[in-house]
Amino acid sequence: MRIRADVNAYFRSAKIRSIRFIRVPFCYITQMDINDIKIAAERIRPYVRRTHLEYSNSLSKRIGVHTSVKFELFQKTGAFKARGAFNKLLTMSDAERAKGVVAVSGGNHAQAVAYSSSVLGVDAVILMPANTPQVYVDATRGYGATVELQENIGAAFV
């Protein structure tokens, strides 16, 4: 399978031995190695739930390798996004956290930032599209964030 070969080659390459940033519109992609992942896992351990893995027979057959799925739906916010939100907030300085955070999302990322900010005592403003389902808006507010609705997601970047 070509994709699997490409992924394996990438992870064996020397490129990932050091962190570097790649500029992409509206985001930065960070390259990291397994030690960075272990450090992040330890950092967020007190704040996230350890979810279980389950072997997937159908997925394993489909892609040709032993595959397990991780049940991140059991995180407090119902998704894996809390891991990244906690990790980011925990790597910010006290001065940076004191300024608060702003996120743009109409879904799981919004709730993850709102929840992790609330737990860590950081003010959060979440910009959400005006057509975001009310259940997501309510959940995000329920975690303590200030929600500002935008006519479209692009307006949040202006």
Regions found by a protein language model. Name each.
Residues 1-31:
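Intrinsic disorder/low-complexity segments
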Residues 31-158:
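PLP-dependent amino-acid enzyme catalytic core
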